[in-house]
């Protein structure tokens, strides 16, 4: 098989419907659009128009807003950190912070901080320098002999 022999699978494409080609074709004259009216004209597509009925976007009340000051955190589970320690991606000799987690490949994109969650088990003794930890995660870290440093909010 060569690149020039590639084609669509059988049944993947459908022939174009040729409309307006005489009475005998079955789709002549009005081309399947019926007779007169707004929807028979070209260029009609009224998004949100429901035929004069009050549209849904006006029937429902306005709700909520977007908080531009909201912090967006990278959520990391303890199990994921233990896996990185086991595979040798994470050095436990120095404190673990957002940059160390990024370099280890545990988080992909740097956000406003790191949020530690308690999913999984942690056996390694690690010092964490993160924005937030859940109570259960903090207990597991301290039980393993590690500690958590949470910087104070400015």
From Swiss-Prot:
GO terms for biological process: translation. InterPro entries: Ribosomal_uL15, Ribosomal_uL15/eL18, Ribosomal_uL15/eL18_sf, Ribosomal_uL15_bac-type. Keywords: Ribonucleoprotein, Ribosomal protein, RNA-binding, rRNA-binding. Residues 1-44 are annotated as: Disordered. HAMAP family: Ribosomal_uL15 (MF_01341). Binds to the 23S rRNA. This is Large ribosomal subunit protein uL15. It comes from Bartonella quintana (strain Toulouse) (Rochalimaea quintana).
């Amino acid at each position: 098989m060569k690149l020039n022999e590639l084609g669509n699978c059988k049944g993947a494409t459908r022939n174009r419907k040729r409309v307006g080609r005489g009475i005998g074709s079955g789709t002549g004259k009005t081309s399947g659009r019926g007779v007169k009216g707004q929807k028979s004209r070209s260029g009609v597509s009224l998004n949100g128009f429901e035929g004069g009925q009050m549209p849904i976007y006006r029937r429902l009340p306005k709700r909520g807003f977007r908080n531009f000051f909201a912090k967006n955190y990278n959520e990391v589970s303890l199990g994921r950190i233990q896996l990185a320690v086991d595979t040798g991606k994470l050095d436990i000799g120095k404190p673990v912070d957002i940059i160390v987690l990024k370099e280890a490949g545990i988080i992909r994109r740097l956000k406003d901080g790191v949020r530690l969650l308690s999913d999984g088990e942690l056996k390694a003794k690690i010092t964490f320098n993160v924005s937030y930890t859940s109570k259960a995660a903090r207990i597991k870290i301290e039980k393993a002999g590690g500690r958590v440093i949470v910087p104070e909010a400015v």
